[in-house]
Structure formats: structure tokens, C-alpha cells
Amino acid sequence: MEYLIPGEIITEDGDIELNSGKNAKTLTVSNTGDRPIQVGSHYHFFETNKALIFTREITLGMRLDIPAGTAIRFEPGDTTEVKLIPYSGYRNAFGFNALINGPLDS
């Protein structure tokens, strides 16, 4: 009998492609702050910390194209390229920095 390991995920053999078919955008982001900023996989990128400098208006309704539950850390003074994908589902955003609090497509 095989024993289960708590939290273990058993997948089929082969590669798993995350977020396939999503229209990804590549964006350059600079941290102009004096502290590291960490952004989680499903955080509405448009509403991230103001010390992150990028073309903010094109990120409305977008999140990082990284596995769920992970994050990217932007160190002070660093410039990083990231990939973003659009939210799916009902496309509503509530919370974060309270800039939207409703539908993303209205």
C-alpha cells in the first residue's frame, strides 16, 4: 500500500501547460521604493504598490502568469520583466486597493 503525503499532488506523466490559450502580455516593472514588494499570483496587477513603475493602464484586469499560490518579489531598485494574463470567470475585482470594486469590463 502506498502512503499519502499531506499536500502531495500526483499528476499524469508529461508536461502541464499553465494558462494555455491566455493572451499574455510582457511588461517591464521597476521597484522605485526602498523595500521589497511581493505580488501574489492572483493579485490584480493594476492595483499593486505605487512604488512599482510600469504602464499601469494596460494592466487593468490582469494578473501574473505564474502558478497559483506563488509570488514574484521585486527588490528595491530592480527592473524585472513579467508576463501577465487576463482574469477569467465573472471578471469582477473587489478589495486589493479598492480602485475597482466591481466589474473589470464596464
Swiss-Prot record:
It is found in: Cytoplasm. The keyword Hydrolase applies. Pfam families: Urease_beta (PF00699). It is an enzyme of class 3 (hydrolase). GO terms for molecular function: urease activity. GO terms for cellular component: urease complex. Its EC number is 3.5.1.5. InterPro entries: Urease_beta-like, Urease_betasu_sf, Urease_subunit. Pathway: Nitrogen metabolism; urea degradation; CO(2) and NH(3) from urea (urease route): step 1/1. It catalyses: urea + 2 H2O + H(+) = hydrogencarbonate + 2 NH4(+). GO terms for biological process: urea catabolic process. Keywords: Cytoplasm, Hydrolase. Heterotrimer of UreA (gamma), UreB (beta) and UreC (alpha) subunits. Three heterotrimers associate to form the active enzyme. Belongs to the urease beta subunit family. This is Urease subunit beta. The gene is ureB.
